[in-house]
Every structure is written in structure tokens, then in C-alpha cells.
Amino acid sequence: MIFKDYDFLQNYDLKNFEEKVKIYKELLSKFNRIHNLTHLKNIDENIFDSIKILDFYDFSKAKNIADIGSGAGFPAVFLAFLLQGNFHLFEPNPKKAAFLRTLKIECELSNLHIYKEKVQEYQNIFKADIITSRALMDVKPLLEICKNLKDENTVFILWKGSEIYQELENIKDYEIFENNLRKYCILK
């Protein structure tokens, strides 16, 4: 995938991003052979899906971004490749957390922090400016398990499918941006 062709990425260091993406793909391939981290067929498509939110939302003021259920790193790892904020990834699966820790070392990502625990068990030392999650669970339970990380200024950014409209019943302050079948939901 040629990232320089996308206008919303013009203000980022794409050479560094593409180098880190290459490391990511090599490491994922290596780990996937042993640990079966993901069944994704088109990694580039999922990387693009992870960073497309930058076309809709400005992360520049966010100091602490928490990602819930980080799995193989979508979307947080790719945002961390591009952005300066501190990314706190919560992934209780030991194999996936080990992959993320190895990736942090290999890509020299000092802004990436990996927590091998469920977010609801985390004794917080920070409040997140932004909380991200990609298709982990319905909105209301997600809001509940993140209560230790949020305050009145926290914004949730969720990567969802068409079911998002039913999940937002009785929730008032949100925006949805669409890219093909993906719905990017921003809850304020």
C-alpha cells in the first residue's frame, strides 16, 4: 500500500511509518506461524482502516490514548507509529501481549505501553484523553469497563460495523464517520 497517496497523511513522517509497518508485518508473520494471533487476510487493508480515523479526528492534543482489547495491534499500534501521544494497550491474552511487547522493542516505540490485563482490573495512574477499541464489544459494556480510565473530557473512538446504530440507543452525544462498511464512532 502506498500511504503517501492519501491527503490526510501528508503531515506525517511516512518514511518512518512504512519502515515500522514492514517490521510489524515481518513480526506478525513470525508470531502468527506459532501463536495464531489473527486470521486477517489483508493486513494493508486493516492498517489503512486503523489510520483512516486521522481523516476525521484530530489526535494532536491527546497525551494519553488507551486501546481496549488490542489484539494484534489494530488500530493503536499504527496510530502510535504516526502520533506523539502515549498509547496504553490493554490486552489480557498472554500471546498477544507478548507480540505487542516484542513489537514495541523492535520498533523502538517508547510511547507504547502494554498491559497484560483486562482494563476493568487496572488500577489507574492516568486518565485517558481518548479511548479506542476496534469491534471488541457493544458500546454500553465498553463504557462501563472503562470507567476507571475516563473522566468528563475523555473521548471514545470506536471502530464498528453496521450494528453501531442499535448500540447507540439512548446515547446522545456522538458522531459517525463512514468509510465503506466501517463506521468510526466518536463518543464525547
UniProtKB/Swiss-Prot annotation:
Q: Where does S-adenosyl-L-methionine bind?
A: 69, 74, 119-120, 134
Give the EC number(s) under which this enzyme is classified. Answer: 2.1.1.170
Major enzyme class: transferase
Q: Which reaction does it catalyse?
A: guanosine(527) in 16S rRNA + S-adenosyl-L-methionine = N(7)-methylguanosine(527) in 16S rRNA + S-adenosyl-L-homocysteine
Cellular component GO terms held in the UniProt record: cytosol
What UniProt keywords apply to this chain's record, in alphabetical order? Cytoplasm, Methyltransferase, rRNA processing, S-adenosyl-L-methionine, Transferase
Where found? Cytoplasm
The entry lists its GO molecular-function terms as:
rRNA (guanine-N7-)-methyltransferase activity
Coiled coil regions in record: none
Q: Which family does it belong to?
A: Belongs to the methyltransferase superfamily. RNA methyltransferase RsmG family.
Q: What does this protein do?
A: Specifically methylates the N7 position of guanine in position 527 of 16S rRNA.
Q: Mind telling me which NCBIfam families this protein's record contains?
A: rsmG_gidB
Q: Tell me what this protein is called.
A: Ribosomal RNA small subunit methyltransferase G
Give the species. Campylobacter jejuni (strain RM1221)
What gene is this protein translated from?
rsmG
